[in-house]
């Protein structure tokens, strides 16, 4: 039997945007088992992932939602192609794709939980323009940010969430 055949396959956990995502909200209205409700603060940090690279990206995204793959690679002292390979291995997607998913998640939360205008949401989510956000939304969700908001934001959103 070949050595390779004896070796048991090791499953590697793939990292997702959720592993380093930090909510845009300050607080959410939470209903407790006893029926009473109160606002609870939303955590503004992420739990360490165990990956130096993912944790570094999480820290960078807390400060700069608009960072691009090339600049992140430079910041951690890696060549862009090495970073691309590492992210492909860690997440199953390129760093560019990962950053876009992160930004779309931010935008979705802004859209469903606030009354901010689309241009401001694009800016806060790290997009260079409202049209860039709209294009990414169309590709990912098949709708505009405005349509997404209309379909997903609860009527009483202002009573459910606190944001800055």
What are these regions (language model features)?
Residues 38-41, 45, 49-68, 87, ...:
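Basic, amphipathic alpha-helical hairpins
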Residues 3, 9-35, 39, 43-46, ...:
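…primarily DNA-binding HTH/wHTH and HhH modules…
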Residues 29-35, 44-47, 60, 80-84, ...:
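Short amphipathic alpha-helical segments, especially helix-boundary/capping motifs
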Residues 89-125, 152-164:
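Terminal helix-turn-helix DNA-binding modules in bacterial transcription factors
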Residues 36-37, 70-99, 124-147:
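Basic/polar phosphate-binding segments, predominantly the helix-turn-helix DNA-binding elements
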Residues 48-52, 78, 102:
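A generic alpha-helix signature
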